[in-house]
Amino acid sequence: MNAHRDKLPGQNAPIFQCDTEIRVCYGDTDAMGVVYYGTYPRFYEISRTEMLRYYGIIYKEVEEKGMILPVRSIQINYLKPAYYDELLRVRSFMEEIPAVRFIIKTEIYNSQNELINHGEVVLISTNQQTGRAMRSPAWLLEKLQSVSTAS
């Protein structure tokens, strides 16, 4: 995990952040040897899952407690291509503790440390039984508060 990061204009400082390395495999690419555009949401998911895990929030345990986090929206900006066998650094971060919406921003850097892709995924705290949006439960907020004040 990298604790420092330069802010882009209009961004708040992240309170949760984690970098994950992903090597582009053959199945991630198209016939031209570049990462297929539809692969990036999977990279985002791997990175945000690892970020939440780093801070002690494990999806499986969240689901066992009756909450799910479906994707409400995803926005992706493609700046440069990534290639087969390239090692990418995928950085996910949150700028605020979520009440209902988890807004997770993601940046992908190539092996030359150039920003090649960035975007945002919005997850909604949802009651697993009813399928309705819910406020993040106290246990989750307490966990997030404790790690945000510790960093």
Residue ranges and their predicted role:
Residues 115-116, 133:
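A structural signal for beta-strand boundary/capping segments at domain termini and interdomain linkers
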